[in-house]
Amino acid sequence: MNVGRKLKTLMFLSGTLTIIAEGIITYLIVSIIGIPTIFTAIFLVILWLIQWLIAPYLVGRNTEEVGPGDPLYEIVRKIAMESKVPTPRVFISYEEYPNAFAFGNYITGKRVAVTKPLLDILNQDELEAVLAHEVGHIKHLDVEIGMALGLIPTIIGYVGNFLLFTGWTLLFFAGDEVELILGLAMLAIGGVLFVLTFLLQIFVLWFNRLRESFADFHSATLYKDKAPYLATALAKIQIYAQNIRTDPFTGIIITAPPIKLKENERDAEELVMKWLHEHISPFADILMTHPHPAKRVKMLYSILQGT
């Protein structure tokens, strides 16, 4: 089975299992509470719409849009045309970590953003490979799909955390037996919801990792000769992140690694070779939103070799 067909099969399987698991758990919860199913469905749709509408403004803060004529915009425009999707709006983000991301909706316009540190550490080929990955997310509607599948675990998680916090507060300040029992009940229900959230997140994260791999697949098949550059881009991001020093109390970056082009290129190539020969457990990234870098690099090179 080739890489593309395998990814599509696994995405169908993981997506189906995620929807079934979320459906069963939601049905059990609303049945116990006694809320009509139709009201629950309407409530979820409204929440999804609110999230869909406001997310671009939250994600897009601290960004600056670039337009036609800007080199970054022209790269994205070329990739979008070859991917057969409308050109998204293009932004430079002034976040402190090297990253690129796709976001937006049909009202605000689909968007692609690249952080300034990423622009500083990648060469032209690596940047094109990364942007092809992000355009792949837009082509595959990953923003909308990911938001929909993540909605139910998010709601259950918020309710669970609220009950746990309230339960502990009641226990701490309990003035009589009723408040003590109520606090214990909230802790018990909150604990159950926490476990359910964790289990659902396992499914959602599995699906998310496959969508990331599918975006890698889009980049590597659109520009097959640039697959190694996506690998070195991942390595440079990893190296940069490992060398960032942050304040342990505020999380603010104290120092970031200086950009040394020759050393950066050599270190990235060495890390890619390490990943290619590294044995990774199937469960190494079970709690991660993205596949382990070694898995991503191995897939990219398998596409390059036509296996």
Swiss-Prot record:
Q: Annotated Gene Ontology MF terms?
A: metalloendopeptidase activity; zinc ion binding
Name the major location: membrane
Q: Show the InterPro entries listed in the entry.
A: HtpX_protease (IPR050083), Pept_M48_protease_HtpX (IPR022919), Peptidase_M48 (IPR001915)
Q: Which GO terms describe its biological process?
A: proteolysis
Residues the record marks as active site: E134
Q: Which domain of life is it from?
A: Archaea
Q: How is the cofactor bound?
A: Binds 1 zinc ion per subunit.
State the compartments where it is located.
Cell membrane
Swiss-Prot/TrEMBL cofactor(s): Zn(2+)
What this protein is called in its record is Protease HtpX homolog 1
